[in-house]
Amino acid sequence: ASDITEFQESLQDIHAPGLNIMYGDKEGNIAWWATAKLYQMPDSAQTKLIMDGSNGAYEPLRFLEFSENPSAVNPPWNYVYSANNQPDSIAGMQYPGYYLPENRAKRIVELLDGIDDWDKNAMMIMITDATSLVNVEISRNLTKLVNVKKLSEDDINLLDKLSAWDGDAHLKSVEATVFHRWIYFFLKNTFEDELGPELFQQFLTTHFHKRLIAPMAQKKESVWWDNALTEETIENKKDIVLSSFVMALESLKEELGESSSKWTWDKVHTLEHGHPIGQVDMFRSFFNVGPFPVDGTREVINNMFFTYTADGQNKVSSGPSTRRIVDFSDIENSVSILPTGQSGNPFSPY
């Protein structure tokens, strides 16, 4: 393609998988397109569930034209982005999809709206940002429900720190450590009694559980609050929130000691780049890169994903595959680096 028009025309041939395509050129054009062969389903179709395909009642009504796909071409707000989040409604409806939560998208918009004179250095800081505004909202929604009469003075101090937390998951953050341990037990105490241990662990590997943490933290009434295993007691949200907080603290005390000042994020959030040969213990230190303590967390711009587990060891399993900043005013000023840097060259000073 020689220009944005030719580039856009070529995208309509992408049917699957669905991709977010970002565009920029030296003429100053910017664009984002959601590319896939989308279709319209009957209003009665519950697309999140398995449907009866035998009677034809849930067949797609039509395939959409590519022009109906979500997109933004040279928008008036002067930037485009994607964090695999749910796009705004198109033609009065939202398109269903397997989206990630809005955490990263909200932070991207906040940062981009706050600065007009972006340069390479500012962008380098942005792409390693580890703050989640959504986690701040979740933390405040949960902390206000905790019955402090049942906590020690030290526990109350921790609760106060969480209620004032700015959502930054830096290496020395105690709040990030407590928050994620609390969320694990919050999910466990809410869903495991109905799902069972095996299905609950599968549930923790889905995008769906990421998208419901914030709504459940805000939701007052739910059938999920009651523990199905306690027939004589009907638990409410406050019971689940308090018991989860207490269990999180007990878990951290057992793992990291009684002093909460030592519960820093670098103790529980690590990254190791594995090599096939490094799976053998005796070769691990020679072939693997790491493990290292690493800042960032799930669903922030510096997206270091880990699956919640009972042992609380938040081992990063995925993250940015590359970091790249292209300066169209000076292409030679662009930078790019892989996650493992120069580690494949043992003689490199880097």
What spans do the regions from the language model cover?
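C-terminal/peripheral segments of proteins
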Residues: A1-L151, N157-D160, A164-Y350
